[in-house]
């Protein structure tokens, strides 16, 4: 038997005695406030306590335990708590021990804390020990803010010298395999209720039988995620180097169709590194049938905490557990177990027979035939390594290829690396490694791991990473890509846990001068082209008549009010290719990881004015093209071209050149400037701008107390949330990962779906609708009060449109468009605050070309009729960086005016924000131009990319402050933040294992900087003035008599505002 509970009346069966409310009131209620189900405590439970009329955080419920504790002993405290009151956020609850001494100050020991919400019970656990026995020992529960009621269902305090460890286990279904071994699980058969067990984000209770010959079992209910279940801390009972056998008797209940997966998992927590999850075993359980779940594990290293837990069934299905045993085995037993289970290869590969040394065992063909070869093509194709390779022939589809099922060996939330060497029978095509996943609820997902351009001439490496958010019913990795009829050769194919990468340090940046032009002879002051050379067979010479002032954005960035150009320009003639033009080598002048701004005057000759011509400032970095800015020119005027770039890898040669117009068109360039930008100076300016745009003067006026008591009282003002909207892109699989969900909910208040609302996803085939993912994501957002953007109703770019729509014309296409917008907005009426109506209209023209000229405007009109409260947006990329001549701010403004002229109810301007090496002045210029439309501007898909996390953080800081400091910008959406779930490489803020990287830390620092904190005293007039950001605040007032805490809101606005604080 376990040790007795030293707390008296721990289940409140006898009412409130001998508990004592500390400065507040308490009473016992007999019904469960959160559920009509059986309560989680024993069947003898008397109900729960409500601690109310709390005016201080430390007020709660306490009990004197002096006579029932002793020095030198360790005690484990376990409580079941909740909160109640008029609030939505979670509240902190603490368990504390007060040690009172007659001859020395009182001590306080924090035992543990948790966060409770209004809708469910949570467990609060911890331990304490007493070194020297005090005069009085008091256990109490405290913590929620004043005004919030504290609910307590049970309290237990037990000595940790429980005799559970010494008991011989009962001969149950789950433990009779090892009747002589010692079970390290406490309370393995729930004969002592839920003692030593905890629920993981859900509820549980024990069903006890009145027949002493029948066992009890635990019921885990109110599960909203697959990973939620029952867990026990076994840290002190396992050791590295030993193997352990797990056996559990499990079942399921609820709306089960067929069987449901149940998993046994080990969680290894480390203070200095990411938490690891180790799959022990799995089984499939059905209603009313008990199944035995077995597996083995071994603890490597020395984790700070080891937790065993059971999880797996889909949300809404209850998990039943009758008994759990974990026995230590000998090393030899463990090795035999590994062999019997066909464990992965010795290097931790989860693929079996990766190099085909055992023939084609464990491999299968996905819509193709598999064969092994020592050579092909008369010995011209030989293995890249080893003695043989496999071929996938007679492929019937692009997705046909070699595959292996890894269901039994893959773990969720663990990063895997897949690598292969591939070759094609002929031609050149993309080869891709893909992971197919089917979940227990029949939902399917295809995860692209990596792709490479495969060739007939040589072997090429295919390498990438993947991670599973949820627990799969089936997981298969395969190689696909080339058209049917092309054979794919595979030399080896391995999948193994990825090695943890070393975080990047802040790079060393060589000394450089901000604003110094690194282009030689840019002004052409002496009338020669020294420093310049022609790229290609064109001719260069110096001409006169160009502007004598710097281009506008160069002036802004360099803070120069007067120009000093010579009025000369480089003229390139006899151009026979678009790439030909003036060039110079700048290898020694470019510093790694420095962001450079590009600015120049450009003009074209008369021969190119019959059609628009692109002019591009470009760099060739070891032969690779880097965009430095592009502008469209269709007249004889001088135009400014702007852009930016950064080089992050040592280069042997960096060449600057100007290119773009059609062959035969003369090209003129004047005043080309390339200079390092001073980001620190810009950020200092933006902070000042944000103070004007996002703050207002606030006067707190306090009432309810005597003026004499208020005068001189200290005040602490803490902003808890900035009202500036900040959101992120999420996908359906993301919300299966509790670590992802935790970061998202703590840092964002808006969401946009990556692809689940797009037409190609919701209706991949005509009449075949798929709204399941979107429905589940909307439900998730509503559950946590997350506002949503609808992205997108239509997409104008043809490559993003599903084949069946591409094949429609005329009235059939018009009807499909009408059905799409009607179905979507009727189905989700009022669910989305924004809609991107027709994505990327500056880059595509599918609907405009096939329907009448009013089609685009009609999309807006119909959407507004169906959901008049939703704000309707345009959405475009490269608006803010100068990289794309098709999507300049001027062209965007022209598109808006054209739609408005046709009656389209355009409500907002979306700038996607997929930006590289951003320059604040260029971004600000675009925002200033767009703001003339008088419409709200949102960054809708913001991400930045850099191989270095610190530089990535710098880029993100530039973009967030530019948005925050501009009065026309009303919100920012990130296009994701989690590694392996981003659309661009090197753009994540959180590593796949849940660790926040340096870029993510910068993001969190910026969020903290957007909060206002004030300490002061109430003035004689009973008020206190401060200037703070718009948003939610808490204020604490401490007078000579008492302390008061309340909340208030500073609404958006510029004029001073009075806020009445009633104490």
Swiss-Prot record:
Enzyme Commission identifier(s): 3.2.1.8
Keywords: Carbohydrate metabolism, Glycosidase, Hydrolase, Polysaccharide degradation, Repeat, Xylan degradation
UniProt xrefs under SUPFAM superfamilies: (Trans)glycosidases, Galactose-binding domain-like
Active site: 840, 941
Swiss-Prot/TrEMBL GO biological process terms: xylan catabolic process
InterPro entries: CenC_carb-bd (IPR003305), Galactose-bd-like_sf (IPR008979), GH10 (IPR044846), GH10_AS (IPR031158), GH10_dom (IPR001000), Glycoside_hydrolase_SF (IPR017853)
Domain called GH10: residue spans: 711-1006
Keyword Cell inner membrane: no
Recorded metabolic or biological pathway in which this protein acts: Glycan degradation; xylan degradation
Span of domain CBM-cenC: 5-146, 183-313, 348-482, 517-662
Any Pfam family: Glyco_hydro_10
Gene Ontology terms for molecular function: endo-1,4-beta-xylanase activity
UniProt catalytic activity: Endohydrolysis of (1->4)-beta-D-xylosidic linkages in xylans
Keyword Repeat: yes
EC supergroup of this enzyme: hydrolase
Top-level taxon of the source organism: Eukaryota
Role according to the record: Binds to and hydrolyzes insoluble and soluble xylan substrates.
Entry text on domains: The GH10 domain binds to xylan.
Family per similarity comment: Belongs to the glycosyl hydrolase 10 (cellulase F) family.
Name of the protein this chain belongs to: Endo-1,4-beta-xylanase 2
Gene, per the UniProt record: XYN2
